[in-house]
Each structure stands twice: as structure tokens, then as C-alpha cells.
């Protein structure tokens, strides 16, 4: 009920014998209480809406990316299942993800419209938008290569989310570097199975993860590291609208950034 604060404020004033002005004061205090409560309820409603949209759009677009290559293969479905496993999706959550994936595979999936809606709901939360794009890039690279059609779809996504081509290309390099720290999947040479990338990470890989150059000084590298860790902090992302089911992915990304930073410090000899 929206008027509990006013009712209680007036009742307290009457009980305490505050007279006319006491009632007015109680009414004003109650009104302030009701407004604060209403804002809090609206925030929770918007938060749930944002999380639900993020979840559904993630898997819809993933399905659209997969379909863009042509026929959806068993390997593609296996990759999507692996991602659901990484998120610990089971029961109703997994079914919802699978249904969203199927929606995205439809021939007339309105990608641009969906991205505009997503951007609107995530307005002012660039770290959420960045996390969404990183998930899509990771899914596109999951088979060890980026199909030209997948790249075209990713460019559309970036454009609609307000991300420049230069920013997007940097994200690609960062995700490719992250694959060597456990953030990607590559196809084995035979059998059609999939496994995590096994080539050991290099200094260049680590620098790509942080978006810096091997020649950058320690101050520049530390600044980039702290910025990325802040943007990928799991609790902050969930507070801004990341579905709780995807917190594990945010944690894994933060671990990649940490590992890359440790390798750079070791290779360049600074603390």
C-alpha cells in the first residue's frame, strides 16, 4: 500500500496529541517515507527487469551468432551447453537459456531492435554492456576461429551498443589474449571434441588482456589493471543488473585479468 507512511505519521501525531500542526508534520514525514519506499520498490523492479533481459538477450544473440554461420551443428550446441555449465545453469534456468537460444536462431530475429532495447535498459552501465559483448565474442571464438558472418554480427552488436570499431577490435584482442588464461575454447585436431586453449600465455597475450602494449611503463599497466578489475568486479556487476547466474563468468574474467597482470609483472620485473 502506497500510503502506509502517511497513515502511520498521522496516527502517531494524533496519539501524541500534536494537534493540527502535528498532523501536518506527521503527514509530511509519512509522505517522505512513502516516496523513499516507492523508489526502492521501483529500483528492485527495474533491477529484476534488467537481469531478466540480460539473461534472455545473452542466449538469444548467442543463438543468432551460431546460426549466422549457416547450419547449427552439434559442436555449436555443445559449446552453448558448456557455457551453461560454466554458469551452473540447471532446471528452469537452463531451460530458459535453451529456449532463448532457439529464439535467436529464428530466421527473422530482430537483432538491431533487441540491441537497442538492451542498450536502453543498460543506459549508463557501460561495464554491463562490455560484459555482454565479451560473452558474445567468447562464444563466437569458442570453436577456435571467427567466421566472417560472426564478425559481421558482432560489428552490428557493437554499433547498436555505442561501441566504436576501434573499441571493438581492442575487445577482440583482449579476448584472444584471455583465451590463453582459460577464457576460451579451441577445437582439438581430431574427434570433433572441444577443450580449453592449452598454449602457454605470452607477454603479448597478457598485455592484450589488459589492453596495453609490452612497451608501456608500470604506471600505465597498473592503471589499466585497476580499471579492468573495477569494471569486472562480480558484486558490482550484479548490483548493476548482471544476472546472478553469470557471476561465475565475471569471477573467471577477473581471474584472467589478475593472472595476466601477474605475468606482466614477472616478465617486466616490477611489483
Swiss-Prot record:
<keyword id="KW-0812">Transmembrane</keyword>
<feature type="topological domain" description="Cytoplasmic">
    <location>
        <begin position="32"/>
        <end position="271"/>
    </location>
</feature>
<protein>
    <recommendedName>
        <fullName>Co-chaperone protein DjlA</fullName>
    </recommendedName>
</protein>
<dbReference type="Pfam" id="PF00226">
    <property type="entry name" value="DnaJ"/>
</dbReference>
<keyword id="KW-0143">Chaperone</keyword>
<dbReference type="InterPro" id="IPR050817">
    <property type="entry name" value="DjlA_DnaK_co-chaperone"/>
</dbReference>
<dbReference type="GO" id="GO:0051087">
    <property type="term" value="F:protein-folding chaperone binding"/>
</dbReference>
<keyword id="KW-0472">Membrane</keyword>
<dbReference type="Pfam" id="PF05099">
    <property type="entry name" value="TerB"/>
</dbReference>
<keyword id="KW-0997">Cell inner membrane</keyword>
<dbReference type="InterPro" id="IPR029024">
    <property type="entry name" value="TerB-like"/>
</dbReference>
<dbReference type="InterPro" id="IPR007791">
    <property type="entry name" value="DjlA_N"/>
</dbReference>
<feature type="domain" description="J">
    <location>
        <begin position="205"/>
        <end position="271"/>
    </location>
</feature>
<keyword id="KW-1133">Transmembrane helix</keyword>
<keyword id="KW-1003">Cell membrane</keyword>
<feature type="transmembrane region" description="Helical">
    <location>
        <begin position="7"/>
        <end position="31"/>
    </location>
</feature>
<comment type="subunit">
    <text>Homodimer.</text>
</comment>
<comment type="function">
    <text>Regulatory DnaK co-chaperone. Direct interaction between DnaK and DjlA is needed for the induction of the wcaABCDE operon, involved in the synthesis of a colanic acid polysaccharide capsule, possibly through activation of the RcsB/RcsC phosphotransfer signaling pathway. The colanic acid capsule may help the bacterium survive conditions outside the host.</text>
</comment>
<feature type="topological domain" description="Periplasmic">
    <location>
        <begin position="1"/>
        <end position="6"/>
    </location>
</feature>
<dbReference type="InterPro" id="IPR023749">
    <property type="entry name" value="DjlA"/>
</dbReference>
<dbReference type="GO" id="GO:0005886">
    <property type="term" value="C:plasma membrane"/>
</dbReference>
<dbReference type="InterPro" id="IPR001623">
    <property type="entry name" value="DnaJ_domain"/>
</dbReference>
<dbReference type="InterPro" id="IPR036869">
    <property type="entry name" value="J_dom_sf"/>
</dbReference>
Amino acid at each position: 500500500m502506497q500510503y502506509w507512511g502517511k497513515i502511520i505519521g498521522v496516527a502517531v501525531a494524533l496519539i501524541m496529541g500534536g494537534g493540527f500542526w502535528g498532523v501536518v508534520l506527521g503527514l509530511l514525514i509519512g509522505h517522505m517515507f512513502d516516496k523513499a519506499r516507492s523508489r526502492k520498490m521501483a529500483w528492485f523492479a527495474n533491477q529484476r527487469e534488467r537481469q531478466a533481459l540480460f539473461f534472455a538477450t545473452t542466449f538469444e544473440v548467442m543463438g543468432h551468432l551460431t546460426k549466422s554461420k549457416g547450419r547449427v551443428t552439434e559442436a555449436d550446441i555443445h559449446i552453448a551447453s558448456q557455457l551453461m555449465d560454466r554458469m551452473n545453469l540447471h532446471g528452469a534456468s537452463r531451460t530458459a537459456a535453451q529456449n532463448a537460444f532457439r529464439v535467436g536462431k529464428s530466421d527473422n530475429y530482430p537483432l538491431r531492435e533487441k540491441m537497442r532495447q538492451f542498450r536502453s535498459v543498460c543506459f549508463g552501465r557501460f561495464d554491463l554492456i562490455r560484459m555482454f559483448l565479451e560473452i558474445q565474442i567468447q562464444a563466437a571464438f569458442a570453436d577456435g576461429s571467427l567466421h566472417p558472418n560472426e564478425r559481421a554480427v558482432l560489428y552490428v552488436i557493437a554499433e547498436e551498443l555505442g561501441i566504436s570499431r576501434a573499441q571493438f577490435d581492442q575487445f577482440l584482442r583482449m579476448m584472444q589474449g584471455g583465451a590463453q588464461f582459460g577464457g576460451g575454447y579451441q577445437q582439438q585436431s581430431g574427434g570433433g571434441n572441444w577443450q580449453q586453449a592449452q598454449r602457454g600465455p605470452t607477454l603479448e597475450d597478457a598485455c592484450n588482456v589488459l589492453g596495453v602494449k609490452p612497451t608501456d611503463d608500470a604506471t600505465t599497466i597498473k592503471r589499466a589493471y585497476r580499471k579492468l578489475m573495477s569494471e569486472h568486479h562480480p558484486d558490482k556487476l550484479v548490483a548493476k543488473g548482471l544476472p546472478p547466474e553469470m557471476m561465475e563468468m565475471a569471477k573467471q574474467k577477473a581471474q584472467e585479468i589478475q593472472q595476466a597482470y601477474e605475468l606482466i609483472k614477472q616478465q617486466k620485473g616490477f611489483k
